[in-house]
From Swiss-Prot:
Reactions the enzyme catalyzes: cytidine(1402) in 16S rRNA + S-adenosyl-L-methionine = N(4)-methylcytidine(1402) in 16S rRNA + S-adenosyl-L-homocysteine + H(+)
InterPro entries on file: RsmH, SAM-dep_MeTrfase_MraW_recog, SAM-dependent_MTases_sf
Name listed for the protein in its UniProt record: Ribosomal RNA small subunit methyltransferase H
GO molecular function term, any single one: rRNA (cytosine-N4-)-methyltransferase activity
UniProt xrefs under CDD domains: AdoMet_MTases
Length: 314
């Protein structure tokens, strides 16, 4: 369902991109979903300061920066994505500042923002990079770390060391996989597993063949969420981010599955600092879905930071 929450006329088309060779190369890799709806929902205005908590390849930041004198603080824990965003947003110079950090660990200091956007989940660039191990479509090591390195556990570590009970719980909790027990037992029988294709084949062998999606999709999602601590990071962000806004400032969060959307919905409803602006989630129209299939599962929620006087009356 598409909603116009502001009464604003249809926003100018944002999909043409900022002119320049660097941008066009990046833009072929990734198109930000619900871009127009996000910018309208944030009520981006000249001179505003905005936080892009998951800059990715820079699509939402670029759209914000097209408004005169706006500034953006752009965060990402993925160094590769941050490097691409730097290229894309280079024409905006000092109006954008980059930080290599997970949004749950961000410290704004004295800065307060007119709007915050977080586009959750994995970007198309990450999914299409074989060496990252996020997708069953490519032969690669079972890594799945968003930061691309460090000492954190990899997906291979979890697959090869967790008990069948632990794996089953992980696949059910983070992937909502109804065949979690069967898959976990088969993995324990066949391990060690070192590559994405090995894991995908083992999962496929454990469950019925007729599935609406690839049989390994939910298992890969669950492992990615566990490896990167995504649930805990999102909970921390949802708790802290309202305090980063000026009174009247807006939050926009785009999620791609219920494990992301559910905490946003319930946290915001219970938060006395916020007014929820979206009774139902905003979803992509058919035209966007046709041009960008990733948009089909995207859900946008919006909230507004209450002023102290509004909080006292609520």
């Amino acid at each position: 369902m598409r909603q116009d929450l502001t009464g604003t006329p249809r926003f100018f088309r944002l999909t043409q991109g900022y002119p320049g060779r660097a941008h066009s190369a990046v833009n072929t890799l990734h198109r930000s979903v619900l871009l127009e709806e996000t910018i309208v929902g944030l009520q981006v205005h000249p001179g505003g300061l905005y936080l892009d908590a998951t800059v990715g390849l820079g699509g939402h930041s670029e759209a914000i920066l097209r408004t005169e004198s706006t500034r953006v603080v752009a965060l990402d824990q993925d160094e590769d994505a941050l490097a691409q965003a730097r290229l894309r947003l280079a024409p905006f110079g000092e109006r954008v500042r980059f930080e290599h950090i997970n949004f749950a660990e961000f410290e704004p200091g004295e800065e307060r923002f007119d709007g915050i956007v977080a586009d959750l989940g994995v970007s198309s660039m990450q999914l299409d990079s074989p060496e990252r191990g996020f997708s069953w479509r490519f032969e690669s090591p079972l890594d799945m770390r968003m930061d691309g390195g460090g000492e954190a556990e990899t997906a291979a570590d979890l697959v090869n060391t967790c008990s069948a009970e632990q794996l089953s719980d992980l696949f059910w909790r983070y992937g909502e996989e109804r065949f979690s027990r069967r898959i976990a037992r088969r993995i324990v029988e066949r391990r060690p597993l070192r590559t994405t294709t090995e894991l995908a084949a083992v999962v496929a062998s454990a469950i019925p063949t007729r599935q609406p999606i690839h049989p390994a999709t939910r298992v890969f999602q669950a492992l990615r969420i566990a490896v990167n601590g995504e649930v805990a990071a999102l909970e921390t962000f949802l708790e802290r981010s309202p305090d980063w806004l000026v009174p009247g400032g807006r939050l926009a969060v785009i999620s791609f599955h219920s494990l992301e959307d559910r905490p946003v919905k319930h946290r915001w409803r219970a938060d006395p600092r916020l007014e929820v602006l979206t009774r139902k989630t905003i979803t992509a129209g058919e035209a966007e879905i046709q041009s960008n299939p990733r948009a089909r599962s995207a859900r946008l929620r919006l909230a507004r930071r209450l002023s102290p006087s509004e909080e006292s009356r609520s």
